[in-house]
Regions:
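Well-ordered alpha-helical scaffold segments within catalytic/enzyme domains
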Residues: 25-38, 113-128, 162-174, 220-235
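Low-complexity, Ser/Thr/Pro/Gly-enriched N-terminal "stalk/linker" regions
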Residues: 1-20, 45-89
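Long, well-ordered core segments of solenoidal/helical folds
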Residues: 1-7, 43-60, 133-150, 181-198, ...
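Hydrophobic, small-residue-rich alpha-helical packing segments that form membrane-like cores
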Residues: 136-142, 153-204, 211-218
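Aromatic- and histidine-enriched alpha-helix N-cap/loop-to-helix transition segments
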Residues: 15-26, 39-42, 46, 106-114, ...
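Asp/Glu-centered strand-loop micro-motifs enriched in Gly/Pro and often flanked by an aromatic residue
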Residues: 1-37, 99-104
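A conserved hydrophobic secondary-structure block that centers on an alpha-helix together
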Residues: 95-97, 103-158, 164-168
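Conserved small/polar residues in nucleotide/adenosyl-binding loops
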Residues: 262-269
Length: 269
């Protein structure tokens, strides 16, 4: 509501809370698909209205940034080149890190990925396109970013829910641009200069045969790659996924089914 201009205030909490709200929205839509509770429908409509109002015309939305801009008297919704003028919010980022996705710890791509998923599930459950339209705008913004950003900045992502998101958007809309983006995301991964085992980007994905690093980041990546394989049938991706799957279920999984958070320094052979 603050980002939408409904009320005034400051952003509170970690920068990935947008994504958590979109996951909540996806959950509400899933429940509504079963029980058709009109109160849930109204709840979703009210939430979506805020999302739509907070989203820029170019498709970008990240409430820490939007709120920071509003409080500084900057309205990037009206700027001709809003991607370059965006002011990074107060949570992370330095003075020289301006523009969308300048600091990956803002979790912007993570948030946008979950907006895509929420928009699709809401559309399936209700037949409405209000949130799906916002997701399309966000996906188009992401496509434009990856087509125009510097190579190093384009590789700058963690917790890559957008890998799954863009494939699901391709499935929902049939837009081939989204599938091309999903393939490109895998191609450029591991080419970043400061890649780490923790972020699964020290080496290209097609050279990875063991699970490594941060479990949340890893499982987002593996699920997204599986989606790309499902659409393209690329056998190399299946080889990587099969090997990683076997490594997890035989060596790095609790008896409860949980994937452990870290495995200490990853093997480098």
């Amino acid at each position: 509501e603050i980002a939408a201009g409904v009320c005034k205030g400051e952003h509170w909490g970690p920068p990935f809370h947008d994504g958590d709200m979109y996951k909540w929205m996806e959950g509400v839509a899933s429940v509504y698909a079963v029980n058709k509770d009109p109160e849930l429908d109204k709840l979703m409509d009210n939430f979506i209205a805020c999302v739509v109002k907070a989203q820029r015309a170019d498709g970008y939305i990240h409430t820490p940034v939007v709120i920071e801009e509003l409080n500084k008297g900057i309205d990037s919704h009206t700027l001709a080149d809003s991607q370059q003028q965006t002011v990074i919010g107060t949570k992370v980022g330095s003075e020289d890190e301006k523009g969308a996705f300048a600091n990956r710890l803002n979790f912007e791509t993570y948030n946008l990925g979950h907006l895509m998923m929420a928009g699709i599930v809401h559309h399936r459950a209700t037949g409405k396109t209000t949130l799906l339209d916002a997701a399309v705008k966000a996906t188009d913004f992401l496509c434009h970013f990856y087509e125009t950003a510097s190579a190093e900045l384009a590789r700058n992502a963690i917790c890559p829910s957008h890998y799954m998101g863009v494939v699901e958007m391709y499935r929902a809309t049939g837009n081939p641009r989204y599938l091309e983006l999903s393939k490109n995301l895998i191609d450029i991964r591991g080419m970043v200069e400061s890649g780490t085992d923790d972020n699964q980007d020290r080496i290209p994905f097609r050279d990875q045969y063991r699970a490594m690093g941060h479990a949340v980041r890893a499982n987002y990546l593996y699920a997204g790659v599986a989606d790309v394989y499902a659409e393209t049938g690329e056998q190399q991706l299946m080889k990587n996924l099969t090997s990683i799957w076997n490594d997890i279920v035989t060596r790095k999984m609790y008896v409860t089914g949980a994937c452990l958070l870290y495995t200490s320094p990853s093997p480098r052979d």
